[in-house]
Amino acid sequence: MTLFESARAVANAGGDGAIDWDAVSEAAKAATDPGDLDLSEAEAEAYAADVRDARAQLRDVSGLEFDVPETVEIQNRHHWVDANVATFRRVFEPLNERASYLPGVARSLNTATTAGALAFVSRHVLGQYDPLLLADTSDHALYFVHPNVVGAADSLDVAFPRFRRWIAFHEVTHAAEFGAAPWLADHLEDQLEAGVAALADGEVRREAFRELHVAMTAVEGYAELLMDEAFDGEYADLRAKLDARRRGGSPLTNLVKRALGLQLKREQYERGRAFFETVAAERGLAGASRVWDDPEYLPTDAELDAPRAWLARVTDSAGETAE
């Protein structure tokens, strides 16, 4: 697979939609080395054991009832691309339904941009909890991109089993959140559908995307808090190294991250973590977990920077007396 093959896949993009998803998959994979996925049975079982342990310890610490996907998918980069092309295809279906008027050059540009984004992320993503938004199933999925986990552990000078376990705990925290808040997937789907439908009509509904960003900031921030409570070992060095990894990279890499909006992901981690650290300091983990009781308890954009205002609102809504 070569960049030439990737370019050829984009050039041959066809169909009637805004994006040729088959060409996206082909081009993204042509531009990306799949990585080594030669695991022994014991190595594969170690991932599953970490997930089981994470579920047990997260339930004990948080009191949240949730399940993890029955199948833990240990992927190479191409597998991850395929899984996410399927998600993107579902999310952007309204664009394809209303884009038959697009000239071929626009379709090729959309295809190339999406393929480039997926190729780039596939080389960096470590794990992913996938709630399978907008899918015709109530199932969910858990992915570990093994070549990237191995590479990151090596570059950060961290023992692979310990790093693998850290990633497993982080992704299982997301399963805990979606399990604790059955409404969360529907809420995210509503915002996605509203935003994409507006784009299909030639509009930009900023409010939908803003609410989506705020919700994901809460998701990432609570996950960071829960990780700190549940992980079974020293983690300060892992946290510091991963924070540096999120902020680091060459100037070109950082430019690409900014262009793809990946800097927003780092902002979600940092802003969400600061919010929940303040909440937990005042009301403990149980107080922070109130965020999943009702969609109305999600913080607003302003409250993310004023967590005590959120605490006051949630306390008043529940008819409680503030401490």
Give each language-model segment a name:
Residues 222-323:
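Pan-zinc metallopeptidase signature
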Residues 150-167:
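Short pre-active-site segment immediately N-terminal to the catalytic Zn-binding motif
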Residues 1-82, 161, 287-323:
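N-terminal low-structure segments adjacent to metalloprotease catalytic domains
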Residues 171-188:
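Catalytic Zn2+-binding segment of zinc metalloproteases
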Residues 186-223:
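Acidic/histidine-rich catalytic neighborhood
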Residues 48-148:
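Auxiliary, metal-adjacent structural segments of Zn-dependent hydrolase domains
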Residues 38-41, 206-214, 259-265:
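Active-site rim elements
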Residues 57, 175, 179, 226:
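Short alpha-helical functional segments enriched in proximate histidine and acidic residues
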